[in-house]
Amino acid sequence: MKKTVIASSLAVALGVTGYALTTDNSAHASESTTNYAQLANLAQNNPSELNAHPVQAGAYNITFVKDGFKYNFTSDGQSWSWNYTYVGGADTVATTQAAPAAQSTDYSASYSNEASTQSVSSNQQSSNTNVEAVSAPKTTSYSASTSSSSSASTGGSVKEQFLANGGTEAAWNAIVMPESGGNPNAVNPAGYRGLGQTKESWGTGSVASQTKGMINYANSRYGSLDAAIAFRDNHGWW
């Protein structure tokens, strides 16, 4: 579906003084909840903002859990990276050291603004050993990858389930990743939801039902999945 995105800088969205962090990287308790919610919202719904700018000046290491997702934002003062992984835990107060990621991970998203290699440095991913991240170049584009770990309860990673239910590699890369980052539970402020970020009822279903819904949607609206991919590439929405 067509979506209108109103862009804003990190300074406007999150305050010109950064994220209410002191010089020792500890969070002000009275301000952390709001800032964590804003950071989480950017990671889920507007990752290009995080790709374009560090969240604050200087080196930092910000980690917290929000709505079941564990978020980590790091910088050495020159380059920066961020990622989030679903762990299913309760919201926690941020710490300056990243905690080990849960082994039941089904999907994650991450970004690094360093050179375009096939993996980020080990110190940036030490808490997410099950995540296969793809680094992105220094542009406002967003790059993410689903976890390669499998889960008996879900039948494999999100990408594996998508491909097993009729989805294609091309559709995953051209539609799913730009729209939702591979997160089947993604919901943006305008109400678009799921892997394909539509307002269709199947957008809140299982990965299998979302995959089949996306294929039917592409066939009925564009004539074929390939035609839908071409439209998404040309227009930036579908």
From Swiss-Prot:
InterPro entries: Lysozyme-like_dom_sf
Keyword line: Glycosidase, Hydrolase, Secreted, Signal
GO molecular function, one term: hydrolase activity, acting on glycosyl bonds
Region called Disordered, residue ranges: 115-157
Compositional bias per record (Low complexity), positions renumbered to this chain: 116-131, 139-157
GO cellular component: extracellular region
Subcellular location: Secreted
Signal sequence interval, chain numbering: 1-29
Superkingdom: Bacteria
EC numbers: 3.2.-.-
Family listed: Belongs to the transglycosylase family. IsaA subfamily.
Function text: Is able to cleave peptidoglycan.
Protein name: Probable transglycosylase IsaA
Source organism of the structure: Staphylococcus haemolyticus (strain JCSC1435)
